[in-house]
């Protein structure tokens, strides 16, 4: 049953690649299909070094205007609900927690409320001695898609660094 559902979605995506405007849209769309809640996911974290202040970085991770600069084409928010737009598709996420200049955590709303593997989190750390700023991205991915998920985040964070002038 799951395999049939996956094959149907692969066929849909393959037939509609012209609508899915770029690789990022494809990978994000693929990762949040409903079938994904049926497949066990593995948590992973990636650390990126930034030449930016935690305050500025936080603005790009926590506000609709900041997120629309690098994460998606556009972002709307109403309270804790954020709607992310990529071309003709949109996905909703709930802001689970936000600690100024330190942490932002979102949960995709396509899954069950109690699903622990349906969130992504940004953690900002600053080394007290060197003052180096790091961003740690925590996400979940099916084991067989782990490398693609990491490549997606690498590409997204590269865009963020470019926006911040931190390349």
List each model region and its residues.
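Asparagine-rich low-complexity intrinsically disordered tracts
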Residues: 8-10
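Hydrophobic ligand-binding cavity/cleft-lining segments
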Residues: 13, 19, 23-75
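Charge-dense, helix-prone N-terminal extensions
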Residues: 37-41, 48, 52, 68, ...
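Hydrophobic pocket/interface hotspot
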Residues: 57-58, 67, 82, 95, ...
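Hydrophobic-ligand binding "helix-grip"
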Residues: 73, 85-134, 138-142
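A conserved amphipathic terminal alpha-helix motif
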Residues: 140-167
């Amino acid at each position: 049953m799951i395999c049939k559902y996956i094959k149907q979605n692969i066929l849909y995506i393959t037939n509609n690649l012209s609508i899915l405007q770029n690789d990022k849209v494809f990978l994000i769309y693929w990762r949040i299909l409903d079938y994904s809640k049926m497949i066990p996911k593995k948590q992973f974290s990636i650390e990126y070094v930034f030449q930016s202040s935690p305050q500025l970085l936080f603005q790009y991770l926590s506000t609709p205007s900041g997120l629309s600069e690098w994460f998606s084409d556009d972002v709307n928010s109403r309270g804790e609900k954020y709607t992310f737009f990529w071309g003709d598709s949109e996905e909703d996420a709930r802001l689970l927690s936000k600690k100024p200049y330190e942490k932002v955590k979102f949960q995709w709303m396509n899954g069950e409320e109690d699903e622990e593997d349906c969130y992504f989190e940004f953690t900002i750390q600053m080394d007290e001695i060197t003052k180096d700023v790091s961003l740690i991205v925590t996400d979940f991915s099916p084991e067989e898609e782990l490398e693609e998920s990491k490549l997606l985040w690498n590409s997204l964070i590269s865009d963020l660094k470019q926006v911040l002038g931190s390349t």
